[in-house]
Amino acid sequence: MLTFTQLKPPNGDATVTFTLALTAEERTRSRHRFETEDGKVVFLHLPRGTVLHDGDILLEETHNSLIRIIAKPELVVTAFAQTPLLLLRAAYHLGNRHVPVEITPTYLRFSSDSVLRAMLEQLGLEVKEEILPFQPELGAYGQHHHAH
Protein backbone atom coordinates (compact mmCIF):
# COMPACT_ATOMS: atom_id res chain seq x y z
CA MET A 1 0.00 0.00 0.00
CA LEU A 2 1.31 3.45 -0.92
CA THR A 3 1.30 6.11 1.79
CA PHE A 4 0.96 9.75 0.74
CA THR A 5 2.36 12.21 3.25
CA GLN A 6 2.96 15.57 1.54
CA LEU A 7 0.55 18.06 0.01
CA LYS A 8 1.69 19.93 -3.08
CA PRO A 9 -0.08 22.81 -4.85
CA PRO A 10 -2.27 21.97 -7.84
CA ASN A 11 -0.20 21.54 -10.99
CA GLY A 12 -1.93 20.56 -14.21
CA ASP A 13 1.44 19.67 -15.77
CA ALA A 14 2.47 17.22 -13.04
CA THR A 15 2.88 13.61 -14.15
CA VAL A 16 0.81 11.65 -11.65
CA THR A 17 0.82 7.93 -11.00
CA PHE A 18 -2.83 7.83 -9.87
CA THR A 19 -5.91 9.96 -9.47
CA LEU A 20 -8.15 9.68 -6.42
CA ALA A 21 -11.76 10.84 -6.66
CA LEU A 22 -13.10 11.89 -3.25
CA THR A 23 -16.36 13.43 -2.05
CA ALA A 24 -16.29 16.69 -0.09
CA GLU A 25 -16.56 14.80 3.20
CA GLU A 26 -13.80 12.36 2.21
CA ARG A 27 -11.50 15.28 1.33
CA THR A 28 -11.56 16.26 5.04
CA ARG A 29 -10.03 12.93 6.13
CA SER A 30 -6.32 13.54 6.53
CA ARG A 31 -5.51 10.02 7.74
CA HIS A 32 -7.51 7.38 5.95
CA ARG A 33 -7.29 4.38 3.64
CA PHE A 34 -8.86 4.81 0.20
CA GLU A 35 -9.11 2.79 -2.98
CA THR A 36 -8.57 4.35 -6.40
CA GLU A 37 -11.08 3.69 -9.18
CA ASP A 38 -8.70 1.10 -10.64
CA GLY A 39 -8.48 -0.76 -7.31
CA LYS A 40 -5.14 0.52 -5.95
CA VAL A 41 -5.16 0.90 -2.15
CA VAL A 42 -3.61 4.15 -0.89
CA PHE A 43 -3.25 5.60 2.58
CA LEU A 44 -3.28 9.31 3.31
CA HIS A 45 -1.14 10.33 6.28
CA LEU A 46 -1.30 14.12 6.12
CA PRO A 47 -1.12 16.71 8.90
CA ARG A 48 -4.31 16.64 10.96
CA GLY A 49 -6.84 19.18 9.78
CA THR A 50 -5.69 19.09 6.16
CA VAL A 51 -8.60 19.61 3.76
CA LEU A 52 -7.96 18.54 0.19
CA HIS A 53 -9.23 20.40 -2.86
CA ASP A 54 -9.90 19.44 -6.44
CA GLY A 55 -6.57 19.34 -8.28
CA ASP A 56 -4.33 19.00 -5.22
CA ILE A 57 -1.26 16.81 -5.66
CA LEU A 58 0.01 14.44 -2.96
CA LEU A 59 3.54 13.06 -2.78
CA GLU A 60 4.13 9.50 -1.63
CA GLU A 61 6.47 9.02 1.36
CA THR A 62 9.31 7.58 -0.76
CA HIS A 63 8.93 10.46 -3.25
CA ASN A 64 8.33 7.99 -6.09
CA SER A 65 4.62 8.58 -6.77
CA LEU A 66 2.25 11.50 -7.15
CA ILE A 67 -1.52 11.30 -6.87
CA ARG A 68 -3.99 13.96 -8.04
CA ILE A 69 -7.13 14.58 -5.98
CA ILE A 70 -10.35 14.93 -7.97
CA ALA A 71 -13.62 16.27 -6.55
CA LYS A 72 -15.93 13.29 -7.00
CA PRO A 73 -19.44 14.09 -8.26
CA GLU A 74 -22.03 13.53 -5.52
CA LEU A 75 -25.73 14.14 -4.90
CA VAL A 76 -26.23 17.81 -4.04
CA VAL A 77 -28.97 20.42 -3.95
CA THR A 78 -28.33 23.62 -5.88
CA ALA A 79 -30.46 26.62 -4.91
CA PHE A 80 -31.03 29.74 -7.02
CA ALA A 81 -32.75 32.96 -5.95
CA GLN A 82 -34.45 35.77 -7.86
CA THR A 83 -32.56 38.40 -5.85
CA PRO A 84 -29.20 38.63 -4.06
CA LEU A 85 -31.04 39.34 -0.78
CA LEU A 86 -33.01 36.10 -1.03
CA LEU A 87 -29.81 34.15 -1.72
CA LEU A 88 -28.21 35.85 1.29
CA ARG A 89 -31.20 34.92 3.50
CA ALA A 90 -30.90 31.30 2.37
CA ALA A 91 -27.16 31.29 3.16
CA TYR A 92 -27.97 32.68 6.62
CA HIS A 93 -30.47 29.90 7.35
CA LEU A 94 -28.14 27.17 6.10
CA GLY A 95 -25.25 28.63 8.12
CA ASN A 96 -27.45 28.73 11.20
CA ARG A 97 -27.75 24.96 10.84
CA HIS A 98 -23.97 24.53 10.37
CA VAL A 99 -24.49 22.98 6.95
CA PRO A 100 -21.43 22.82 4.68
CA VAL A 101 -22.31 25.10 1.77
CA GLU A 102 -20.68 25.97 -1.53
CA ILE A 103 -21.33 29.69 -2.01
CA THR A 104 -21.21 31.59 -5.29
CA PRO A 105 -22.75 34.90 -6.41
CA THR A 106 -25.52 33.01 -8.24
CA TYR A 107 -26.24 29.83 -6.26
CA LEU A 108 -25.80 27.89 -3.03
CA ARG A 109 -25.01 24.17 -3.06
CA PHE A 110 -25.16 21.62 -0.24
CA SER A 111 -25.39 17.85 0.25
CA SER A 112 -28.83 16.53 -0.57
CA ASP A 113 -31.25 16.92 2.34
CA SER A 114 -35.04 16.91 1.91
CA VAL A 115 -35.72 19.06 5.00
CA LEU A 116 -33.28 21.78 3.91
CA ARG A 117 -34.58 21.61 0.36
CA ALA A 118 -38.15 22.16 1.60
CA MET A 119 -37.01 25.06 3.80
CA LEU A 120 -35.41 26.84 0.84
CA GLU A 121 -38.45 26.21 -1.34
CA GLN A 122 -40.61 27.82 1.38
CA LEU A 123 -38.29 30.83 1.33
CA GLY A 124 -38.95 31.13 -2.42
CA LEU A 125 -35.77 29.70 -3.92
CA GLU A 126 -35.62 27.45 -6.96
CA VAL A 127 -33.90 24.20 -5.97
CA LYS A 128 -32.80 21.17 -7.91
CA GLU A 129 -30.98 17.95 -7.12
CA GLU A 130 -27.88 17.28 -9.18
CA ILE A 131 -24.87 15.01 -9.22
CA LEU A 132 -21.86 17.33 -9.32
CA PRO A 133 -18.52 17.90 -7.59
CA PHE A 134 -19.18 19.66 -4.26
CA GLN A 135 -16.67 22.17 -2.88
CA PRO A 136 -18.07 23.72 0.31
CA GLU A 137 -16.59 26.65 2.20
CA LEU A 138 -14.25 25.67 5.02
CA GLY A 139 -15.77 28.12 7.47
CA ALA A 140 -14.23 30.92 9.48
CA TYR A 141 -11.91 28.57 11.32
CA GLY A 142 -11.14 26.16 8.49
CA GLN A 143 -7.47 25.50 7.89
CA HIS A 144 -6.10 26.25 4.46
CA HIS A 145 -2.61 24.95 3.93
CA HIS A 146 -1.77 26.49 0.56
CA ALA A 147 -2.95 29.04 -1.97
CA HIS A 148 -5.33 28.23 -4.82
UniProtKB/Swiss-Prot annotation:
Pfam families for the chain: UreE_C (PF05194), UreE_N (PF02814)
Primary localisation category: cytoplasm
InterPro entries in alphabetical order: UreE, UreE_C_dom, UreE_N, UreE_N_sf
DNA damage keyword on record: no
Species of origin: Nostoc punctiforme (strain ATCC 29133 / PCC 73102)
Lineage summary: Bacteria, Bacillati, Cyanobacteriota, Cyanophyceae, Nostocales
Record-stated family: Belongs to the UreE family.
CC per GO annotation: cytoplasm
Subcellular location: Cytoplasm
UniProt cross-references to CDD domains, sorted A to Z: UreE
Alphabetical UniProt keywords: Chaperone, Cytoplasm, Nickel
Keyword Cytoplasm in record: yes
Coiled-coil annotated residue ranges, if any: none
GO molecular function, one term: unfolded protein binding
Protein name, per record: Urease accessory protein UreE
Gene responsible for this protein: ureE
Purpose of the protein: Involved in urease metallocenter assembly. Binds nickel. Probably functions as a nickel donor during metallocenter assembly.
GO BP terms, alphabetized: protein folding; protein-containing complex assembly; urea metabolic process
